[in-house]
Amino acid sequence: MRELRLAGSTGSSRIVIGASLKDLGDYVDSRRIIMLADSNVARLHRRLISGYKWVDVGSGEKAKSLRSIEKICRRLLDLGADRSTTVVGLGGGVACDIAGFAASIFMRGLGFGFAPTTLLAQVDAAIGGKNGVNLDGYKNILGVFNQPRFVLVDFDLLQTLPAREILGGAAEIVKHALIGDPEMFAYLEENGHRLLALERDAVEEVVGRSAALKIKIVSVDERETDERRKLNFGHTLAHALEKTAGISHGEAVGMGMMFATRISLARGLLSGAVERRIEALIRGLGLPADIPAAAGLLLETVWKDKKREAGALRFVLLEDIGKPVITKLDRKELERYLHDLC
C-alpha cells in the first residue's frame, strides 16, 4: 500500500493506492457516511455498502445533470445529512463527479471522499478536485474545484470491469505517460497487455505512477491556469467525439491523442519516429486512432469547448514523449487540421 498527499486550496487530499474499501472506517467515522453509488456498482458490490446509508445516483453521462443533483440533495435531506456527514462517491468518474459536486453545494459544503471503481477514475477522475456536471450535452460545463478528503484506490474493485472500461483507463494512463513520464510510456510498450489483463504488479506500477504525476501537476496549478492544462491532452477533440459520435470516453481519448500527435507532426514539433511509436502503442492497446465523425460537425462542437478564449482554442501538443506544449489554434487552423488529418 502506498499513500500520497495532494495539498489543495480547499484542503489536503489523502490518496491511498492499494487500499481496501472494507477498511473505509479507518479513514472516516463510518456512522456519518452517506454513499452516493453508481447503480451498477451498487448491484455488484451490495455487500460492501450494506452497512451504510446510500443513494443510487444512476449511471452514465445522463446522470450528470442538475436535475439529478437536485434529486440527490433531496435524498440527502431525507437521510438526515448535516455538516458532520461525509459523502463517499462509489463508482467511476460519473459517480465521483456527482458526489463531489453534490457534497460541495449541499449546506454550502460537506466533507467527501471517493472509492473509485474504474481504472479511469483511479488514475484520473477521482484525483485533483474537479467536480462537475453537464449542461445541454456539454461535458463538465458546470462545476467546482474542491478536493476530496480521501481517495481509496482498491484494485479488487476493478475485477468486475468489462474490457471496454479497462481500455478507457488505459487511454488516460497513456495520456499521463505522454505528457510527463517517458519511462512509463516505455513500460507500457512492453507491458500494456499485462495492464489490460489487470495483472496486479502492472496495475500497481502504472496506477501509482499516474496518480503521482497528476498530483505533481495539480499541486502547482490546482485551478488550471497553466500547468494543469496539459492534462487536457487529447481531450479537446475527445469531448466533441463523445457528443457527436456516441463513442466511449476511452475510444474518444485515443482518437484525440492521435489527432493532437498528428498536428504536432504537421507543425514540425514532433519527429515522425516518435509519432509512429505513439500510434503503435495506441493501436496496440486496442484503442482506435482514426476519427469517424464528419469534420464539419466536429468543428462546431469543438469550437464550443470551454477551453476556447479570445477567438482561439487552447490545444496541447507534443514536442516529444514527456514534453507537452500548450498552443492556440484559430478556427481556420482547426478546420484545416480536421479536414486534412481526420
Predicted features along the sequence, with ranges:
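ATP/NTP phosphate-donor binding region
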Residues: 1-86
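Glycine-rich beta-strand-to-loop/alpha-helix junction loops that act as flexible
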Residues: 59-60, 90-92, 233-234
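Non-catalytic interfacial helical region
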Residues: 73-90, 99-114
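Short glycine/serine/threonine-rich phosphate/pyrophosphate-binding segments
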Residues: 94-101, 122-123, 240
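A glycine/threonine-rich phosphate-anchoring loop and its flanking beta-alpha core
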Residues: 101-194
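C-terminal charged capping/lid subdomain of soluble metabolic enzymes
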Residues: 171-173, 270-342
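Active-site segments that bind and position negatively charged phosphate/pyrophosphate groups
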Residues: 186, 191-294
